[in-house]
């Protein structure tokens, strides 16, 4: 007996030249709105984030097949009711045997194209932000991009990969009909209804400039879409920037804490990672915590403190619905890691010979 979801998906995919369009139907998964009761106990700045990987989806024969299969994986991921879902770099074309000219597959950045439209409809249906990494074109240039789609299916922001590989930049070397233009160094962090987020792509992680820019722009979550997994360098930058990192790659997916420690990862049979994170959270060197006993004595289980010995980092987060961490920092004169580093740099500059 054929799977009903496969039949529905086939009908869904046949409507355009790409094989995608129409409506997302036949899914057996709950939408976020259907399961909203499960979110009522969330703290004010708690957010569920999820990332999928491409393992077992490549190589693939056609873009239509790839998009079909990634949508099924996304439907699995939305069972955890994410506020934000991240897809891998160039998920619709990466390791797909069907070769098409770049001008044909690149999407418009202002008006949703064939692929972006499908992902936008998915985002709207499931009431979640989605990072949609695709080729884009703008003013005669091609970019390796990540498009942030909001809960209503609108394009909320576009990021251009700052550091393409040399083969990406050379016309006809990697893609038919053109090479990639490197993105600008100064790109924004994007506002969402839960906080500021930023995006990086693959080879970008080998340079500090993108990470430094997002730190200055106040990104609390960095979405790393990639072909290669990134490895421990992602953990380093999560700790260095005191931000959460969610990685969605060709081989794995991970959620990384602001301390630099892994919180979740995709597994052999579950090809997405998810975690409910608290954005009302700071990191500070463990040796600065002399006032912590007083903090615990006053607020008890309304705060959560965890020491990460390997990095000598301690994280503090609010667990109370009306208790703001910014107020606790002022009350107990807690120096966050970022404040400690910036004030130390000021002292160094002032006293250096």
Where are these regions (language model features)?
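CN hydrolase (nitrilase-like) catalytic-core segments centered on the catalytic cysteine
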Residues: 111-129, 196, 205-305
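Active-site catalytic loop in hydrolytic enzyme cores
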Residues: 138-217, 232, 236, 240, ...
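Cys-nucleophile CN-hydrolase/nitrilase-fold catalytic domain and related Cys-dependent amidase chemistry
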Residues: 63-152, 228-229, 240
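N-terminal export signals
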Residues: 2-5, 11-32
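Solvent-exposed loop/turn segments at secondary-structure junctions
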Residues: 55-57, 91-93, 136-139, 165, ...
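C-terminal segment of N-terminal export signals and the immediately downstream linker at the start
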Residues: 29-68, 287-291
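A short C-terminal boundary segment appended to hydrolase-like catalytic domains
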Residues: 281-353
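Active-site-proximal beta-strand elements of phosphoester/diester hydrolases
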Residues: 46-59, 195-204, 223
